[in-house]
Amino acid sequence: MPETALLEEVVDRVRPLLGQGKVANYIPALANIDPGKLGIAVTTIDGETIGAGDYLEPFSIQSISKVFSLTLALTLYEETEIWSRVGKEPSGHSFNSLVQVELERGKPRNPFINAGALVIADLLQSRLGAPKHRMLELVRALSQNDKVCFDKQVADSEYQHSARNAAIAYLMKSFGNFQGDVDTVLRTYFHYCALKMNCADLSKAMLYLANRGKTLDGTELISQVQTRQLNALLATSGLYDGAGEFAYRVGMPGKSGVGGGIIAVIPGELSVCVWSPELDTQGNSLAGTAMLEQLSQRLGRSIF
């Protein structure tokens, strides 16, 4: 288990990087965030959580929510029902690409790009009577924090700027790979992205990825095999088009969001969440990646 002093040192060492990235501005509600925030939290498989910096300040988790939605789908569907509609390969295109959807006849490359996450949201909408409420129940239970909520301002802001995601959904619908009402699914999807959580919440919530599918309270959420498979997908496709660089520098399965958060896991040991709102050119937290690289090096840990 790393000590708090180590996490504080990691935060201090990356602070000079502040100012080198750019806060996401295509969602107006995200553009107003203080770019100088830095936080890190670690939860070990014995249930202990420590943190440093702004690790208790909530932020918009954005695409990190795609891990929760895929996990929820895995508890509701046979795997063939999921993987017949979305692939398992890295994209190589931007996370909101229409071109790839067209070229591959409506089947998204993986569940962590927007097209793939929209298919997963469509699956959840088909199977659940109240998909937004069910997601909130899940993340509150996983993080053991019943104050986790949706940021309605962010969800509304995303909906008002949803033309591209709507285009992706309608394009997939034209290929027969989208069943529900596009507007309804989009509203659910944007609420998932607008979950507000802090680094401590997320490191606790993602512990099942490090603990063979078992949550903080010991409940089996998904199987050991499913957990291994999910971590494999995170290692290859969790960081948009920066997955290779992240694997090289950090060496952990991970998932980023344009809110500046990144979650990562060392299977069998710990889950970690970092947050710094300034992004690199790939849309991943610049200082966040550096914090994970520092932590990986200091602990001498990598999955490779």
UniProtKB/Swiss-Prot annotation:
GO MF annotation list: glutaminase activity
- Biological processes annotated in GO: glutamate biosynthetic process; glutamine catabolic process
Hey, what's the signal peptide range on this chain?
none
Is Zinc tagged as a keyword? Answer: no
- Pfam families noted in UniProt: Glutaminase (PF04960)
Identify the EC number(s). 3.5.1.2
Q: How does it assemble?
A: Homotetramer.
Q: What's the protein called, per UniProt?
A: Glutaminase
Tell me the organism: Shewanella oneidensis (strain ATCC 700550 / JCM 31522 / CIP 106686 / LMG 19005 / NCIMB 14063 / MR-1)
